[in-house]
């Protein structure tokens, strides 16, 4: 688009374009390369682009880091979102942005509201302290920042009064939790993500206190290796009193490797999320049917449920059947979740599945009663050709993903052509399907996308023409 303008009008005519037209042109360019090319076409475009550039993503190519960062801040005076990402960094690529670099950023980027620091291994608590001079900072994401401690996060909480979104991922030295207490008093956090921060456990979340009222999104994941070394220590969860957790605003809840203690702690959270729309439970120990039933009876707006269920072999210390999810949970979901669009089940170990968990009939009941658009089954050994036949009546189903579903054969796969609304099919590591099962799809124009990965009896030739777009990969190392 901008090339045509330059050719037809020349530099002089472009300089005479009304401001609103220039802004409109710039707003329609979404890639950095396009905007850079346009800004080089004339001085006016260069100047206006600098004024309108609100986001910046930088990383290994920033050398020397502090000087280059200063130059960028001066060139783009209205930056509000900055991402500094050093994924794949090596020492030969030059020094990373450090505490001095953050000082440069906070001193010269006065409109900063959203900052992401990923793999920034040179930044310490001192650098995080510089963020206190950013009064408008509302979002901070730290991904693998090993030199930052709880003291640094506390200084952030004290200095950045408008912080609404905080992500801490693999911040291994964030040990103290005074910052959680401080946020609990402020009652300002709306989105909190804590993943694989080894020193932070379920029991520490109680320190949020009244901040639970404001939270709309909580993602909390315990480091799996650290958890297993503690052998499912119940001390953390015992610190939670049996009380009502005020979490009416929570819309998204994601828990990984967590202990769900009956009647307290995160179990109270599950039972009081009446406005929840998205639930993800990944390898959470102790979740019971009563927890799910209590949740779905209140959360009538649930649209997405994802469950990764521990197997019997994975949890040798928990043999209480009452602490397992069964068809009672699926029946409750089917009865109360009239808006459910996405449902995913995954078992952690297909060779040692839970003997007391979901049955085929329970899964079929849910699919038949809920308007599910996306269904994903991973290591669900009970799902077979009868299940595929039941999907023929799933009027809303558009996306189906089967992973390690070894009981599905060509007989079931052939039925895909009869699914009323299906347009995306994904098959991975399924031993029972072959090229014969794909034949009815070839040339049928039924599917928009077909993804086949690591299915040993399906060939590239067999999937050719089976969908508008086909992705085929085969790596059979998983079988050996």
From Swiss-Prot:
LRR repeats: 61-86, 94-119, 120-144, 145-170, 171-196, 197-222, 229-257, 258-283, 284-309, 322-347, 355-379, 380-404, 405-429, 430-454, 455-480
Pfam family, one: LRR_6
Stretches assigned to the F-box domain: 11-58
Alphabetical UniProt keywords: Leucine-rich repeat, Repeat
Keyword ATP-binding attributed: no
Gene3D superfamilies linked: 1.20.1280.50, Ribonuclease Inhibitor
InterPro entries named in the record: F-box_dom, Leu-rich_rpt, Leu-rich_rpt_Cys-con_subtyp, LRR_dom_sf
Protein's UniProt name: F-box/LRR-repeat protein 14
Domain of life: Eukaryota
Name of the gene: FBL14
Organism: Arabidopsis thaliana
